[in-house]
Structure formats: C-alpha cells, structure tokens
Amino acid sequence: AHPERTFDVGIAEQHGVTLPSDREGFILHLPQLFTVWSEGGLEGVPESFADFEARVSEVLHEIAAGEGRALVVTSGGVIGMAMRVTMALDLPVMAHACLPIRNASLHRFQPLATGLALTQFNATPHLDQRDRQHAWTHL
C-alpha cells in the first residue's frame, strides 16, 4: 500500500496525468480524474469514490432529517457530490456540473416529501456587483 497521497499526485504517479495549469486543461482533467477515481484506479488516496459518495449522502440525509435550517461550509467537491446524490447524476454530468462552481458560492437544498431538491446553485450575491466580480474564482 502507498502512503496517503493527494488525488493529483496519485493520478500523476499512477496514470501519468499531470494537474493542468489552466482552466481549459482543468475542464478536460476533472472528468478524467473522477472516472479513474470512481473505477478504483487511485491507490493510496484518502478515500475511495464510493466511500466519499456514501459519506456525503449520509450527511445530507442526517441534515435533512434535522430540525430547522442548517448552514454547511464546504468545498466544490462536496457540493458536486451532493448534487450527484440529490439528482442521481451520472459521472460525466456530475463532473460537468462541478466545473462552474465558484469559490464562496451559495447552494441550497430543500427537503421535500420526495427527497432533497436543489433549489439554489452557485449564487454569489456578495460578489455580483461590478466592482466585486474580479473576486469570482473557481480553483
């Protein structure tokens, strides 16, 4: 077994795929990374894709079963997985949906009788003024 490593190091060492340095490269890289990860092709990473999906699903259901509202501060990866779990997204669609997620963006999931529903995606009202749009970041 390998010592724990990050996903970018794992895919570089095990598959010869380096982390891209620009947006266009990352657009192609993310679906590839998710595919390799979901197929169990990354040894020594902190968590398998299946375990990550199960963990996010469990937390979503735990929060939805609670009383009142909840505020969760998290990463784009967790937001993407929450969308996958909530809307049964296949892997290419999930990867594509993750790409536009902005740092410091707001997302809202609402529990309904039929399950969780995504009711807000990628909102940045605190950065939407013209003089703040320079602060929009994705990576």
Question: Which residues fall in each region the model found?
Answer:
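Phosphate-handling substructures
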Residues: A1-R55
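Active-site-adjacent alpha-helix immediately C-terminal to a catalytic or transition-state-stabilizing loop
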Residues: A54-G115
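A generic, residue-level signal for flexible/boundary positions that often mark functional hotspots
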Residues: E13, V93-A95, Q133
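Residue-level signal for functionally critical sites in structured catalytic/ligand-binding pockets
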Residues: A1, V9-G16, E67, G80, ...
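Conserved histidine-centered catalytic loops in small-molecule metabolism enzymes
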Residues: E4-G10, F26-S38, Q110-L139
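A short acidic, glycine-rich active-site loop
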Residues: L19, P92-H96, L139
